[in-house]
A protein has these predicted regions:
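Active-site/catalytic core of tyrosine-dependent DNA strand-transfer enzymes
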Residues: 5, 69-122
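C-terminal catalytic core of tyrosine-transesterase DNA break-rejoin enzymes
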Residues: 26, 30, 36-37, 114, ...
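N-terminal core-binding DNA-recognition domain of tyrosine site-specific recombinases/integrases
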Residues: 14-19, 99-107, 124-129
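Basic, Lys/Arg- and aromatic-enriched nucleic-acid-binding interface segment
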Residues: 1-35, 39, 59-62, 131
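Catalytic-site neighborhood detector that most strongly recognizes the C-terminal catalytic loop/helix
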Residues: 57-61, 145, 152-177
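Mobile genetic element proteins and their domesticated derivatives, centered on retroelements
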Residues: 8, 112, 160-163
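Well-ordered beta-strand positions in beta-sheet-rich domains
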Residues: 52, 63-67
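A short, basic/aromatic helix-end/turn motif that makes direct DNA contacts
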Residues: 40-46, 128, 149-156, 164-166
Length: 185
């Protein structure tokens, strides 16, 4: 949920050692992108003046161009001040063998779980679900399929179907829309 994400970010951003972990999670959730792509994101992918992300996704090579919202922009400006001298947006905060490198998937997973525990989040939550959560929230908000696809990079509406959950919010929205159209008893 959005509250869980906020709780995670508050904890991660509150400590220097986990700030990059927080930024990776923030970007993945905000832009509904894969953690792996955010973990390897480079400054060249960001147009800070235009407040845009330009990304070629690793899985299917889809290209997306997404806006940078204010909260995320502020964190990126701060991160650029501290880490703009090297290529990665959210590297490990301490050099490894003299270089600032991106987190390995295994190290990211362990560090993310440590932040989740420190934030008091339930053990069943998984960082890998951030893309799904954000996409499901767009579906529930009534965002048109084409717009969702422009964010997620999907080229086929069938690929978005797994994100379309049978939830109370979506059922309520559908029945309310039907009623306002005058097609119920």
């Amino acid at each position: 949920s959005e509250d869980n994400v906020r709780q995670f970010l508050d904890r991660a951003y509150g400590m220097w050692g986990s700030r990059s972990i927080g930024l990776i999670v923030h970007m993945a959730y905000e832009w509904c992108q894969r953690l792996g792509d955010m973990r390897l994101l480079q400054w060249d992918n960001l147009d800070m003046d235009g407040r845009k992300l330009h990304l070629e996704q690793s899985k299917r090579r889809a290209e997306v161009c997404l806006p940078i919202e204010d909260d995320l922009y502020d964190m990126l400006v701060q991160q650029k001040e501290d880490f703009g001298f090297q290529a990665y947006v959210a590297p490990r905060v301490f050099p490894y063998r003299g270089e600032y490198r991106p987190y390995s998937l295994e190290r990211f997973s362990k560090a993310g779980r440590e932040v989740m525990r420190a934030a008091g989040l339930p053990e069943e939550l998984r960082l890998m679900d951030l893309r799904r959560t954000g996409t499901t929230q767009m579906v529930e908000a009534g965002v048109p399929m084409g717009q969702i696809m422009s964010v997620t990079g999907h080229s086929n509406p069938q690929s978005v179907k797994p994100y379309m959950k049978n939830t109370y919010a979506s059922a309520n929205s559908a029945l309310t829309a039907r009623k306002s159209y005058g097609k119920s008893t």
